[in-house]
Amino acid sequence: MKENPLLTVEGLTASFATESGRLPAVENVSFQINPGEALGLVGESGCGKSVTALSIMRLLPRPAGRIDRGRVLLGDTDLAILPAERMRTFRGSRLAMVFQEPMTALNPVHSIGKQLREAFRLHEHIADKGLADGKAVNLLRQVGIPDPERRLKEFPHQISGGMRQRVMIAMALACDPDLLIADEPTTALDVTIQAQILDLIKAQQQKRGLSLLLITHDLGVIAETCDRLCVMYAGRIVETADVFTLFTRPAHPYTRGLLASIPRLENQRKTRLAVIPGMVPALSELPPGCRFQNRCPQARDICRDREPPDITVADGHAAACYFAGPEKEPHATG
């Protein structure tokens, strides 16, 4: 029997108020995450990955940002229309988020211990400081922080960037959420620490049976961590597949461009890396039809006239491209 998804995002559109009027940062975004599954959301900076995550968490900056339409179902509960007070109880207990920059996400004037105790007080109604500190010490130990009793008394500026991110992961896991959202969790960390943080997130996800939404621009991170992935471009999802399929048989020209631009150690020839020409269009200057058509080597008149629907390539594999269907060759010109 097929398992019901933990998270279902349907037709999500979120916009921001600008001098040019309201502009959609994400438009008609749809995907699902099953219980215990790790889904990657990948794309260039500004494509709408973080806005998607903030929309799920109902943390878009107000009043500029808002969800215009769509559903965000956590089980049977639509988070998009949940009253604010009830949504606050869901954050932390049902879903939690690890943000890009822990120094700005942590409160600089409160100790690590106080911030962890606050999570226990709000979501588990634990008022006893000794009991909360015991749980906090155990949690810090689980995320690999040495001497956790001492760390409880320290402030965010007193620990390293990698340690701060471990604290953020501990805070996100404090109340055993069903869904963990990690938004570029290794930003500004050196390569060695990046690998440790990603290993920690994956280990905790598997140990606790969490569902994971991992947001990144790094396809290598996706390959190591996720089961499936969605590729975003200019506010829309252009391809969805399991990791193996997408890396071996990408169907959308943008996905192929991303994969072609990855440096390969086995390539000993002194050749230039492949690049995707042009720039991602500004939200106020989106072209008609396919949003990738100005940069696409396969673009034809139909791409400029009409926005492509999601074409089913195979079971579990879809791409928003007129030339992605199974009846076409991978590089068909129509």
PLM features: residue spans?
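Short catalytic/signature loops enriched in Gly
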Residues: 5, 146-150, 240-334
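ABC-type ATPase nucleotide-binding domains, specifically the catalytic core motifs of the NBD
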Residues: 17-20, 58-64, 82, 87, ...
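P-loop NTP-binding/switch modules centered on Walker-like glycine-rich loops
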Residues: 44, 181, 185, 189-271
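Conserved ABC ATPase "signature" region
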Residues: 75-78, 131-150, 259-260
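ABC ATPase NBD coupling module
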Residues: 79-96, 122, 245-250, 281-287
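A short, proline-enriched helix->beta-strand linker immediately N-terminal to the Walker B motif
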Residues: 174-178
